[in-house]
Amino acid sequence: DEAHEGTTTALGDDVIKNLVKEGNGYDTKFLALSGTPFNILKEFDDNIYTWDYVMEQQRKAQWDELHFGDSNPYDELPELKIYTYDLGKILTDKSYVELEDKAFNFREFFRVWTGDIKHDHKAMPATAQVGDFVHESDVWSFLNLITKDDPDSHYPYANEEYRNLFRHALWMVPGVKEAKALSKLMKKHPVFGCGAFDIVNVAGDGDEEERSEDALQKVRQAINGAGNDGYTITLSCGKLTTGVTVPEWTAVFMLAGSFSTSAANYLQTIFRVQSPCNKDGKIKRCCYVFDFAPDRTLKMVAESAALS
């Protein structure tokens, strides 16, 4: 399993050599399983079997027609919906655009002060502290934008209906320092800091005032504590994006990466939210991806389609 990682290492080679036996009556069958096999496809000229998300959803939709009366084993697998917003058009600072590929530069947008003028490219304002956002006013505007109470707005937290759809969400950010700064800012925000939202920072060791503990345990405790009326937002720069299931997550916000982000990492992350969830009699029917770099989204979808 996870063959795109396990079969590409020296340890993986040694394990395979010890297990696969040929001759003297032996004919070991080798099955490499992977949900994101982009880097190992070239090793297989044939005998490639694909079962992807689209096929799964087609089988789910056709089940009653083809197997009337039988329970649908795909019924609880949510439909994945991807929405894109172009932050590059909303935030016009040219430093947010990567020159090489014209994609939105999340690392610059969420850059924090280090106190080192060589790294910061300018003197840190007297009102700022090391670890604060360099572009704090723009990050604040972004938080306002996605929470603005407007009946015509289609941003994720613009009204109570949307907020209930994304009651438990995963936000991917560029790094540990950026996650800490965002957690601090969100707790001051009139919507995210109103007490209804529990901001769970699992990047690195989390926030200084919180004990370092198992990231998954922190998230599950927050979700359980939220009950039926509360919300959670998990901030991560990589944790909980592979080999982990948080069934209650219904949305992932892609606020990190670039146009050159690998399709394998991207898909591993977004499909965290597609895990089934049947809780208190409620089935998760849909899950959502919000990507704020549309060109990157199209590239990822195209690369994933190449597998089919």
Language model features with spans:
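SF2 helicase catalytic motif II
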Residues: 1-31, 36
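Phosphate/oxyanion-binding active-site loops and adjacent basic polyanion-contact surfaces
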Residues: 8-12, 46, 125-150, 178-179, ...
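Short secondary-structure boundary/capping segments
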Residues: 11-17, 43-51, 185-189, 250-253, ...
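Conserved helicase motor "Helicase C" RecA-like lobe of SF1/SF2 P-loop NTPases
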Residues: 175-203
